[in-house]
Amino acid sequence: MVADVVTSRINFYPYTVLPSARPVYQYDLSIHISNQGYSLDNADSCRALERFCEQQDAALGNNLEHGLFYSLIIDFPSSDACPISSFYSQIDLGSRPITHTVEFLSTQKPRRRGGRVGGMRNNIAGPPITPVQATVKVTRVRQMDPTDLMSMKILLNILLRRTFESSLGMLNIRSGFYDLRNPSIHAIQIDGRGYDICWIPGFRLTTATLRGKLGLQILPETTKVRSKSMNELLTERRGNIHPSALAVITVMAMHNGKVFRVHSIVQGQTIVSPLANGNETDYFTYYSTRYRDKIDSAGLSLLRHNDYCNSVMQQDKFILKLTPLKRTQNGKVVRPCNVPSSLCIIISDNEIAPYGVSKLSTNRAAVALSTMSPDALLEKATAFAARLAEDTELQSLLGDYGFGFTSNPLELETFVCKPPKLMMDNTSRIVTIEDDSGGVFHNLLQSPGVSPIYYSNNNQPATGMPVWAIMVPRNLGNDYARRLRKELTERVRSLAGTTAPNIGDPPLIAVELSNQRREMYRVEPYKDAFKALLNKLRLEYKDARESEIVAKIQLVVIVIPGPKQDRGDLYKGIKQFYTHMGIVTQCLLAPKSSQNELQWYDQAVLRSVCQQIYAKAGGAVWAPVLPPQNVYSKSTMLCALDISRPKKTVGRPAEVPISTAGFISTYDGSFEYIYSQKKTLVPNRLNHGGELQQQTLMEAFIKNSCNVYLAFNNRILPDHIVIFRDGVSDSQISATLEVEIKSLYECLRQIYHKSNRPMCDLKVIVAQKTCAMRFSAVGGTVLRSGYYVINRSPDNRQQGSEFLMASQAIVHGTTPKPIRYKIIFDSMEASVDNDSFNQLIELTNAMAYGYVNWPQAISLPHVLHMAHHLSKFCGEVLRNGDDLFESCAIFGLQYRPFFI
């Protein structure tokens, strides 16, 4: 494999463990409040913990100035309303739980209803005045080795967060830190007019492991906001200088990493103040008088720096009254607050969107609010690392816990893996070939019949899709049904190429839906429509039994009513019914009605639907091809296993959810034709989550996959088997090797021994999506898909070799989040310097281009991505019904991606 070497910077600064390092202990914190109607929050739980430490120090005779509380590393929750539940310390409190009864003063005041205490309410800015009695229980959870990378990572994340908020004076927004005092201004053009864009420079700090070392990665990150100030907007000639004149502008503001919409803007405008009868005052005086405490509290909690907060409020003489948005994506409602106007983000056209979105509409033109970093800021990130190395408070804090920090980044060679040689276009059926000399792409016409559709005809392979149907609700009308059938048929035939004559004309089946909304989403009318389809096919196949007629149906396109959020149970019911019958379905939402007319589908939607129909019927929409010199281009079977574990049942937290295992294997040289298997892992008292079943499960999966491969490859087993595994952390690798891989290897040895074949080259690769590493380009280097780093680990405890790859599309500045691929088992024990290892990387990158629904690269190999879809579809939609475990028919449901 020939890979381009790219000049890049990782900005990875290793940490080392000093000889003075001591073990760190993790503790659980449990606080029981005696006061009636009291709700424990973050601040009060910290006060209770402080009182607990004072009593513990008094009992042990410790120095109160540098006692237990001083040594704690508190894991503060992300929400102020949540209490502290755990902390860390190098002081050992013993293995037995310690309990103290404490008293502290809270800022919450008791609410009185009818002379009784009915709960507590917040006194945001006032001093703590309400006495609260609590029982605090501290339990040691575990002892962490100072050399353990995960324990160091936990401590570093907490220590860095505490240092930044206390001494460096930077604003923490999500995982980035921004300095609002040093913005740089740039200009962009929108609709021929220039708009000032304010780039707020910041840095993303992540702790990651690389080459067996824990380190701090510092990458520059920016936030683009409109730099035009609120004062300039208010003083523009808009007819009436009143906040209501800004109706065409939606103002968003940041507060504690959340986004608010501005309810009103107050600056220098006179109103009749309710503070004094009949007297006029200005908005700023009115709001600052009425909401002074709330404004101060919001500013202090936002910046956590008194001097900076006061200077901001003195310079900008107007206040933003913020109201929460409707609901965020995770269902939480943000609370209203007041913030200084200098922290506002201005977005035109009343666009309401969360912070950090990729595109927003401004005067019907796209403006990117990018969180990626321009190349010029990489030098600032390096300088920022030197600043951290010189920070005395940080160095002292790290030294107390036995950490050493270097200001010199770790240098690594980085490469770019080339995209697959052949890539089939999804509409024009053009094959794209890359020129090795200059990287130029040439388009060559290709016969569209390279990926014919296969179907079963009396258990014999045939070509085409003669029997399929379209079910349409009757209320959509005949014109809609005929147009839909015409467009779907033409598009599928264009995809089929030379096999197009074998694509039959689908019959239209009317579905009798009720006009009542409650009765519209019932599955029974679609079952009746299936009976009508069978009756129509009986006229053509008079002598065939019903089971034979059902076996002839290749696919059914079903139109279901919208909107999308209301069709959940109907969609699941349809999928369960037809999958049980062994029929592949493609669901399509009914179009929206506008002025008594149906809006037709977007062409991109129809193209995607037809691609799914073509793939579900047994065709390959496109096929990435490896170079002939790659050893995995011939006689290779790819496998992927993913286990879906749904959330626990609401109301019954003690119940263990049923897990679903999905297994995908390939049996064709193009790696596009798959064989799917599914099994339910039933938990019980001796087998809590079904883990003990995975040993026999993997053996059954690989036996069936080998039998399928034999059937399609002249009874010859593959020379190479590569298994991708998802959902395995570093702590689970040893158990996975012992439970799954060991028995799997012995099973394969028996299979190959019976076939008189030498044992295959078996590789098991774990894909970890939680990698925090990022790669950045320098000097105007253009990053492409397939950017990777070979991670050679000198640590003998780290099993196998690994590489980090960002295979999906590259955006400007930095790569997307890479995937960490760790080879946990290799029967050939290939070195990372071996060509076989590089060819394995090339295989991993090429398979990222094989997913049916996306014509470009995705983040994972398509077999692993489809294994995830299979397990999730069977667990959530099919509700763990009949297992797709063994099949007698070669061309059955398991040979088609019915779950995408």
Swiss-Prot record:
Cell compartments where the protein resides: Cytoplasm
Top-level taxon: Eukaryota
Instruction: List the GO molecular function terms.
Output: RNA binding
User: Any idea which UniProt keywords this protein has?
Assistant: Cytoplasm, Developmental protein, Differentiation, RNA-binding, RNA-mediated gene silencing, Translation regulation
Q: Which SMART domains match?
A: Piwi
Instruction: Cite the InterPro entries for this sequence.
Output: PAZ_dom, Piwi, RNaseH-like_sf, RNaseH_sf
> Domain named Piwi: which ranges?
555-879
Q: Name one GO biological process term.
A: regulation of translation
| CC per GO annotation | cytoplasm
The record places domain PAZ at 229-313
What quaternary arrangement does the UniProt entry report? Interacts with miR2. Highly specific binding to the mRNA m7G-cap. May be a component of the RNA-induced silencing complex (RISC), a sequence-specific, multicomponent nuclease that destroys or silences messenger RNAs homologous to the silencing trigger.
Extract the PANTHER family matched here. EUKARYOTIC TRANSLATION INITIATION FACTOR 2C
Family that this chain belongs to: Belongs to the argonaute family. Ago subfamily.
Q: What is known of its domains?
A: PAZ domain is absent, but Ago is capable of binding small RNAs in the same way as the other Argonaute proteins.
Q: What does this protein do?
A: Plays an essential role in growth and, with Dicer, also involved in microRNA (miRNA)-mediated translational repression. The RNA interference pathway is implicated in antigenic variation having a role in regulation of variant-specific surface protein (VSP)-coding gene expression. Several VSP genes are transcribed but only transcripts encoding the VSP to be expressed accumulate. Antisense RNAs corresponding to the silenced VSP genes are detected.
Q: Tell me what this protein is called.
A: Protein argonaute
Gene responsible for this protein = Ago
